[in-house]
Amino acid sequence: GFGYGLGFHYQENIGNATNPNFANPTINPFGLTAYSPALPEIGLRQHHKFIDLDNDGDFDILSNVRAVDISSYPYAWNSHFIYYENIGTPSNPQFSTPTLNQFGLSTTPNSIVYTTLGDIDGDGDTDMLGFSLNYSNYATDFLFIENIGSASTPNYTAPQLNVFGIPSGINYTLITLEDIDTDGDLDIMFSQENYNSTDFGFVENTGTAINPQFSPPPNVNSFGLSLANWQGQGILNFKDLDGDG
């Protein structure tokens, strides 16, 4: 959502694995609270990711926040990471008070537009991929934040720019990792808002699960994906909603 204080919406599937039916949303369930840090900034967007970051068998939440410091001009753009640990169970989640920039993650200059999580180097822990936008010249950089810790005790490095064959300047910002072609490695899918449509980009991992290599430019609107009459930055999530495997 926009801003630091909007919170979470949750819609339970009250149907089943093959015929999903989602209930009306509830706000801030499971002990979740909006985060209001004592920072001289206005939060613009939070992108939430559900992942078992501490390898204890339940889903935690890591949020990437884009913010602008309006305390002085020219305004400074920063990115933060907010962590909500699930201290409950997989079936009865309960989230702790959120904390800022855990696991070696730190406030970064410019803006990390969006990050996604996955074991990109095949070493058994969760890494990050994303894009950074420099608002001084609107240049984009592809970034990799490696987990040099473990699956249960993550520790993230500083961002590495333009690795795995992805150059700067790719005009797709909302990114997700998925083995879309089921060949055993993680590929990249993007979405990008245009004037009157939203495009989807696919960049295949032509390397391996351990040594990824991507070959841009993206294939646009592959696999029948298209939103020709809808404008917006859709965040891609891959789930088997109809239970067909």
Cite the ranges covered by each PLM segment.
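Blade-edge motifs of beta-propeller repeat domains
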Residues: 12-42, 85-110, 146-170, 204-231
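Short glycine/acidic-enriched loop and turn motifs that connect beta-strands
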Residues: 4-5, 66-72, 133-138, 193-197
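A short loop-to-beta-strand structural motif that recurs across blades of beta-propeller domains
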Residues: 7-10, 80-82, 141-144, 199-203
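Beta-propeller domains
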Residues: 41-46, 64, 68, 77, ...
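Hydrophobic beta-strand segments that make up the repeating blades of beta-propeller
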Residues: 1-3, 61-65, 128-133, 188-192
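Calcium-coordinating acidic loop motifs
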Residues: 14-15, 52-58, 87, 118-121, ...
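Beta-propeller blade termini
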Residues: 46-53, 64, 113-120, 173-180, ...
